[in-house]
Swiss-Prot record:
Monomer. Binds 30S ribosomal subunits, but not 50S ribosomal subunits or 70S ribosomes. One of several proteins that assist in the late maturation steps of the functional core of the 30S ribosomal subunit. Associates with free 30S ribosomal subunits (but not with 30S subunits that are part of 70S ribosomes or polysomes). Required for efficient processing of 16S rRNA. May interact with the 5'-terminal helix region of 16S rRNA. Keywords: Cytoplasm, Ribosome biogenesis. SUPFAM superfamilies: Ribosome-binding factor A, RbfA. It holds the Pfam family RBFA. Disulfide bonds: none annotated. It is found in: Cytoplasm. PROSITE patterns: RBFA. Its main location: cytoplasm. InterPro entries: KH_dom-like_a/b (IPR015946), RbfA (IPR000238), RbfA_dom_sf (IPR023799), Ribosome-bd_factorA_CS (IPR020053). GO terms for cellular component: cytosol. GO terms for molecular function: ribosomal small subunit binding. This is Ribosome-binding factor A.
């Protein structure tokens, strides 16, 4: 089992590298623009791959990016077939990764709490 698990991780990493290259160099869809692939999770049977991404677009444009990636999934899968030496090329499922936005929000909340504590200490000391 551990050997199979590490193979799954290696395949996921390879798919992420190849997809990043394909999206950067081969896709001409203006809806996609600049995106960053943050991770790929491949199922144990290699039939499905969840591709996590972030984008510099605002939230209203995320729908367009998602739609563009879903439309390009067949093309990307075909290109992966030519680049990877696998019997099964997984079906690609693109998922917007909100973890970076959540991290920024948490950081802002922490900064606000620290600033609030400082202002309370300053008013208490005077």
């Amino acid at each position: 089992m551990p050997k199979d698990y590490s193979r799954t991780l290696r395949i996921a990493d390879q798919i992420q590298r190849e997809l990043a290259d394909l999206i950067r160099n081969e896709l001409k869809d203006p809806r996609i623009g600049m995106i960053t692939l943050t991770g790929v999770e491949v199922s144990q049977d290699y039939a499905h791959a969840k591709v996590f991404y972030t984008t510099l677009h605002n939230e209203s444009d995320n729908f367009l990016v998602q739609n563009g990636l879903e439309n390009a999934a067949g093309f990307l899968r075909t290109q992966l077939l030519h680049r990877l030496k696998l019997r099964v090329i997984p079906q690609l499922h693109f998922i917007y990764d909100e973890s970076i936005e959540r991290g920024v929000r948490l950081s802002q909340l922490i900064d606000e709490a620290v600033a609030s504590d400082r202002s309370e200490k300053e008013t208490d000391s005077t």
